[in-house]
Amino acid sequence: MKKLNISADTPLSALFHDGCHDQLVNDIEYLCNFLIDCQSDVDVLKVSRFDFDFSSPKFRPCKVYQKLANMVNRHLLIVSHRELSRYMAEHSNLHASAESIYRSIYKYM
C-alpha cells in the first residue's frame, strides 16, 4: 500500500488507482446524492469534502459505508482500508472517529 500526503484539498479520487477513475465516477456521484451542497456540474473526481445531509429522509449512513466497503472490496484503493477511514474522518461529517468509520466499513465487507 502506498502512503500519501493527504491535505484538506486532497480529493477522494487520489486514494484510488488512476486506471479505475471511470468506475470511481459512479461511486462518488452516488455519494454526492447525499451531500448538503454538491453541484451537478462539479467534477466528482475533484470532490474533497463530504458533508452529508443527515436531515434528508433518503440519507442512511449505512448506504455510505456499503459503498465505501464496495470500493475496498473491488481493490481500487492505493492506500489501506484504514487510511480511507482516516480520510473520511477528516474530510466528512460522517463520524469524527476514524476507528468507528473503519469498523463500520468493515462490517459491510
Regions found by a protein language model. Give the residues of each.
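Flexible coil/loop and intrinsically disordered linker positions at secondary-structure junctions
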Residues: K2-M109
